[in-house]
């Protein structure tokens, strides 16, 4: 299974952690497609703790983390 950890607004309606079958997604962009998250809304995308590109492949037992832009004042 691929573990997808969602942060901030991405959790709304999806929860904190989503699990995906590795047969259903082959790259980071496909993970976003399944979750219906537009790529332009992603500020940070990590695969196993490393900054990654949406073209990077994902495989069984990977842990992904997806962060939207965060602001504060």
Question: What are the language-model segments listed below?
Answer:
Residues 1-72:
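Ubiquitin-like/PB1-type beta-grasp interaction modules and other compact soluble beta-rich domains
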């Amino acid at each position: 299974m691929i573990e997808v950890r969602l942060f901030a607004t991405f959790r709304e309606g999806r929860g904190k952690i989503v699990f995906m079958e590795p047969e259903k997604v082959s790259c980071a962009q496909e993970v976003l497609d399944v979750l219906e998250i537009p790529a332009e809304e992603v500020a940070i995308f990590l695969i196993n703790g490393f900054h990654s590109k949406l073209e990077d492949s994902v495989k069984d037992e990977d842990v992904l983390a997806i962060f939207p832009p965060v602001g504060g004042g």
